């Protein structure tokens, strides 16, 4: 197990998957899977062998109890995991097309007060922070906590305290309009207010990962050099694009890495989160500002292998790889890097 540790903060929820090509709110069979980007990353890191703490909130319900048990079984430090007695664990309706690609259709379970992940308590985080931050090297975060007033305060406190404690921050700029607007929206692009709220935290991060579409919406470019140049500290940037090549800039090294396409794609729900976990796992043992060009290529390719492996199973967490799985996949893969 690696000596350093990672903190993941944000949503833990249930992905309700409908049948391929079907409606998860009405068509059978449905499959309920543990999910939420930060929770996915935490579980993937732990399975690879990293020490991980998770900060989030689950409902006082069967889903919350089962998710808590899963995190404990994975060996994740749950000192920062809160239980909300007023709000349920969020259930996300995920529609998948015939190729396994997914989109979010809305939520189930709200009783009028929202969901547990929208109400992460700052008071409890302040109390529990010493238990989760010890020996931490990285804080991994998404942007969904910014969408709710209560969780946003807790989230921003963690970002600030991590920065002042010398903990590097990796941000997955995962724009999901349904989470911000609490309904299925026909307008995918973020509003000026939503965009500014997310961009305001970028000055504190060391690594930003985002999809090509998100890069275009927030920066009007998917070129990692242009993105990095527009950031306050010219941070490292990784731009994903589904099964298309990944463009990246790590420690001033530029590259384009090609996907490892699994023979059978069942579900892509957790591929991006497994990719993120792979990057952070490799970065625990090396300083970001000291990596060589070859190390940068290897780090990206390791993440790609993690993402590819997850696509072979249902859900974001259950199919996550062990370290041996990735070593074997990389030894067999002919995925190229340029």
Regions from the PLM with identified roles:
Residues 1-77, 104, 337-338:
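Glycine-rich phosphate/adenosyl-contacting loop at the front of the ribokinase-like
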Residues 51-143, 327-338:
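Conserved N-terminal subdomain of the carbohydrate kinase-like
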Residues 131-132, 200-201, 230:
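Structural alpha-helical scaffold elements that stabilize or flank donor/cofactor-binding regions
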Residues 12, 37, 144, 173, ...:
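Active-site metal-binding loops of divalent metal-dependent hydrolases
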Residues 138-226, 244-245:
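Conserved beta-alpha-beta core of the PfkB/ribokinase-like small-molecule kinase fold
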Residues 14, 18, 60, 175, ...:
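Short, glycine/acidic-enriched loop or turn micro-motifs at the edges of active sites
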Residues 1-7, 160-164, 222-338:
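Conserved phosphate-binding/catalytic region of the ribokinase-like
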């Amino acid at each position: 197990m690696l000596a350093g540790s990672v903190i993941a903060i944000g949503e833990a929820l249930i992905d309700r998957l409908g049948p391929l090509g079907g409606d998860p709110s009405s068509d059978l069979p449905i499959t309920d899977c543990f999910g939420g980007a930060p929770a996915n990353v935490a579980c993937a890191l732990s399975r690879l062998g990293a020490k991980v703490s998770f900060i989030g909130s689950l409902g006082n319900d069967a889903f919350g109890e089962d998710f808590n048990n899963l995190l404990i079984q994975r060996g994740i430090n749950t000192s920062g995991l809160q239980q909300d007695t007023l709000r349920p664990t969020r259930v996300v309706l995920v529609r998948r097309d015939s190729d396994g690609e997914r989109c979010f259709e809305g939520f189930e379970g709200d009783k009028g007060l929202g969901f547990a992940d929208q109400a992460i308590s700052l008071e409890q985080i302040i109390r529990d922070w010493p238990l989760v931050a010890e020996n931490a090297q990285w804080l991994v975060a998404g942007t969904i906590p910014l969408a709710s007033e209560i969780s946003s305060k807790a989230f921003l406190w963690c970002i600030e305290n991590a920065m002042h404690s010398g903990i590097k921050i990796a941000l997955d700029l995962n724009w999901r309009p349904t989470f911000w607007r609490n309904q299925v929206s026909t307008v995918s692009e973020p509003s000026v207010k939503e965009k500014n709220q997310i961009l305001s935290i970028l000055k504190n991060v060391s690594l930003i990962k985002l999809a090509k579409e998100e890069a275009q919406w927030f920066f009007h470019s998917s070129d990692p050099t242009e993105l990095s140049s527009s950031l306050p500290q010219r941070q490292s940037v990784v731009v994903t694009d589904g099964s298309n090549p990944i463009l990246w800039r790590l420690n001033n090294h530029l590259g384009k890495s090609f996907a490892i396409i699994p023979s059978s794609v069942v579900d892509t729900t957790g591929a991006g989160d497994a990719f993120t976990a792979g990057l952070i796992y490799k970065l625990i043992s090396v300083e970001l500002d000291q990596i060589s060009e070859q190390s940068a290529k290897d780090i990206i390719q390791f993440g790609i292998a993690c993402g590819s492996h997850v696509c072979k199973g249902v859900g974001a967490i259950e199919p996550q790889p062990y370290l041996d799985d990735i070593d074997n996949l990389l030894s067999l893969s002919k995925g190229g890097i340029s």
